[in-house]
Amino acid sequence: MADPKYADLPGIARNEPDVYETSDLPEDDQAEFDAELEELTSTSVEHIIVNPNAAYDKFKDKKVGTRGLDFSDRITKSKRTGYESGEYEILGEGIGIKETPQQKYQRLLHEIQELTQEVEKAQSTVKESAAEEKLTPVALAKQVAALKQQLVSTHLEKLLGPDAAINLTDPDGALAKRLLTQLDVAKTRKNPEGKSPAKGPGPDNENFVTYELHCRPEQNKFSQAAKMAELEKRLGELEAAVRNDQDTQNPLTVGLQGSCLMDTVEILQAKVNLLDVASLDQVEARLQSVLGKMNEIAKHKAAIEDADTESKVHQLYETVQKWDSMSSTLPQVVQRLLMLKQLHEQAMQFGQLLAHLDTTQQMISNSLKDNTNALAMVQKAMKENLATVEDNFTSIDARIKKLSK
């Protein structure tokens, strides 16, 4: 039942249900609806059609590993651990599903590529020295190359073709069977009648089995770099073993310290080329001109040094002459300064006494003012008390007179 206080208000429809209507949505909902509508109708947004059945079939046996994850808010600078994704599929820990040979091959190939990149980076940064560790980057590079070559040699997809997934459990047997099949086909193959044999390197082209040799330039480059690094290491060890203390003053050994054998040979070859008979005359002429210039420079330098020394001696003599005139008056100046020092000390003490006297005088004057004020108050109080006493005596005399009558 409606509240009776609203019964007599105008504009109320009685005996009808209450209806609340509005023309538009609230402002926040309007803005959100406009943004969604603009995004749906915009030509810049790519609309991707997702097949839910295909997505379900792809991810129905997959699980998300939440071990060690932390998506909580942080107040420190350290980052939280979220989901990680890689370039290949790796089974998570604790799933209980055995890794297939194809997945294992992809994982090993990716790890070897990462190891190769790290070794190449270490080779470019680590300096070669005689006191290296046992597992050097060069040795590690050789091991990585051998491991990668072994993995490439077991590349089952290229060797066995599209049927590799069926025979992954026995790759050696599958490879042997495939080779035997190819040999049998090659033996039993004959040229069809009425057709000429295919062109090839020999007359019996169909009676041979053709094998393809695939060359990897990056692998050859990596092996060559590893060999060069190993050679430089051995040369460094050899130089460290046969090297003796070189004379730093010897002009033939200038610039040879710390250089490798090839650089040393090139430097020595350049120095030997300078000793050619055809260039000795030119070198001698240049040396003569340089020697003449050096002699002229030495003469000018000696003259400049003599003039500089003479000017310094003259300045020193003038200073000594001035000092002679000042030395006679110096004791008197010192005595006068000592007397002035004593006078200044006495003046400072007198100033301190005056300051103390001034402070004391101010204190005394303040005390006198306080005492004067107190005396005035006492005198005033005494006058008031005397007046009161006189009044009391007067009243007492009057009473005594009344009583005596």
Curated annotation (Swiss-Prot):
Annotated keywords: Coiled coil, Cytoplasm, Cytoskeleton, Dynein, Membrane, Microtubule
UniProt record, GO biological process: axis elongation; microtubule-based process
Membrane topology field: Peripheral membrane protein
Keyword GTP-binding carried by entry: no
Major site of localization recorded for this protein: cytoplasm
Xref: InterPro entries: Dynamitin (IPR028133)
Any one GO CC term of the record: vesicle
Chain intervals for the UniProt region annotation (Disordered): 1-24, 186-207
Keyword Cytoplasm among record annotations: yes
Coiled coil regions, renumbered to chain: 101-134, 383-403
Organism domain of life: Eukaryota
Subcellular location: Cytoplasm, Cytoskeleton, Microtubule organizing center, Centrosome; Membrane; Cytoplasm, Cytoskeleton
Family designation: Belongs to the dynactin subunit 2 family.
Self-association and partners: Subunit of dynactin, a multiprotein complex part of a tripartite complex with dynein and a adapter, such as BICDL1, BICD2 or HOOK3. The dynactin complex is built around ACTR1A/ACTB filament and consists of an actin-related filament composed of a shoulder domain, a pointed end and a barbed end. Its length is defined by its flexible shoulder domain. The soulder is composed of 2 DCTN1 subunits, 4 DCTN2 and 2 DCTN3.
Biological function: Part of the dynactin complex that activates the molecular motor dynein for ultra-processive transport along microtubules. In the dynactin soulder domain, binds the ACTR1A filament and acts as a molecular ruler to determine the length. Modulates cytoplasmic dynein binding to an organelle, and plays a role in prometaphase chromosome alignment and spindle organization during mitosis. Involved in anchoring microtubules to centrosomes.
Protein name: Dynactin subunit 2
